[in-house]
Structures are given as C-alpha cells and as structure tokens.
Amino acid sequence: MGKKLLQQRAGRGNINFRNPGWLRVGKVRYPTITGHHIAKVVDILHNPGMTEPVAKVKLDTGIQFFIPAVQGLISGQKIEVGEGSPASLGNIVPAKDLPEGVYVSNVELHRGDGGRYARTAGSYAIVVGKSEGKVILRLPSGKIKEIDENALVTVGTVAGGGVLEKPLLKAGNNYWKYKVKATKWPDVRGVAMNVVSHPHGGGLHQSVSRSSTVARNTPPGRKVGHIAARRTGRRDRK
C-alpha cells in the first residue's frame, strides 16, 4: 500500500504544517488612536520567521505596539505619532501630511487597518502625488496605488535591507530558516521518490514515465501532476 502524499499529510493540520505563530513577538500593526502622541522606542527585536526587525513602541498613554523598524531607528528614541507630526525619520504620520518624494513604510490602505504595504526588510514606498482625499504612492513592486489621506505611514525605509544577499552556504542554515516558517523543507521532487511514496516515483531514472495529466475527479492519493490540463507541452509556433 502506498504512502500518503505530502499534501495529504498537510491537509490533516498536523503540528509540522501549522503556522508557528506562537514564536512571533506579537501582532505587528498600528494601534487605533486619534490625536497627537509622543512615543518611545522601547526596544528593537528580532521577529522569528520574518526578515525585518520590529520596534517595540510605547505611547504616552501607556499603549504598547510593534511596527517594522525603519533604518536608523534606535532604542530609546522619541518619535511622534498621529496628526500634526512632522515627516521625520521614524515618525508615524497621516499620509496627507507628507511632502512628495519622501520614503515611507508600513503603509495603511485605510485608516485603522494596521499597515499593509512595504513591510518587509529593505522595502519602501514613495509619495508621488496627491489628489482629492487620496495620496498617491509608488509601491515596491512599481505599482501606483492610491491610499486614504488619513491612513498612517511610517517615515523611512524598513531596516534589514540586503538580508537576502547573504549566502546560506550550507543546508543546515536553510534548515533553521524554514523551521520557524509554515513551510515544509526540504521539498523533494516526486520523480526522486520511491514508487511507494509518489505516483511519479520509482525506476532507475528520474522520469514520470507515464502521462502526468490527471482528471479533476481523481482520488487524492493519485491527484498530482497536470490536473485537468487542457493541453501540455510546448505550443507550436505560428
């Protein structure tokens, strides 16, 4: 009897396939606030499984929250949050108060969503213009996006840029990289498995050796390859 496929084991919701969210420092988002506040950066922390460091910030009201740390932000630094805050490094300001050309990160689409864009290490968005009730940004992907003028943003570029340029050098480092993520590693190809482990496995060569197209109603243990494909292979040049 054959073994269960990787996707079948993942579908059971075993602890090995669940998102290890308990390792994170907490929810990285803006709090729901109004008015102007003075805040202090309590600490700069590593968030397991994420590329960017996070800053633990405490408001003058006692509320604590986490945001992606921007380049140049230091522990103990005082920042300003909310309406009327200047567009200085590390400050959290409404988008309408920003001049054109400034670099921002952890961008909200609507006020109160906590931040949705430019949150990973080294990323930023650029203010390119303003329209009625909207602020126009260029996102890291190059896409032009309009956000609500009252949406909060952090002035500066997210720290940790270039983290992907550091080579892993050995498989052991890659092991620890994926251990804190909801990703199974290493990812073994079906043709490299034994015949008992995968429909494409077995033989003395790494080839499917049969049609890899399967029907839509194929049973789960055999439903791998090109599922309900209209066509496969290269297209003929016209």
From Swiss-Prot:
Amino acid composition bias (Basic residues), ranges on this chain: 223-238
Source organism, top-level taxon: Archaea
Region (Disordered): 199-238
Pfam families in UniProt: Ribosomal_L2 (PF00181), Ribosomal_L2_C (PF03947)
GO biological process: cytoplasmic translation
Keyword Zinc: no
Cellular component, GO annotation: cytosolic large ribosomal subunit
Keyword Hydrolase: no
Coiled coil: none
One MF term in the entry's GO annotations: structural constituent of ribosome
Subunit relationships: Part of the 50S ribosomal subunit. Forms a bridge to the 30S subunit in the 70S ribosome.
UniProt record similarity statement: Belongs to the universal ribosomal protein uL2 family.
PANTHER family xrefs: LARGE RIBOSOMAL SUBUNIT PROTEIN UL2, RIBOSOMAL PROTEIN L2
Protein name as annotated: Large ribosomal subunit protein uL2
Gene it is expressed from: rpl2
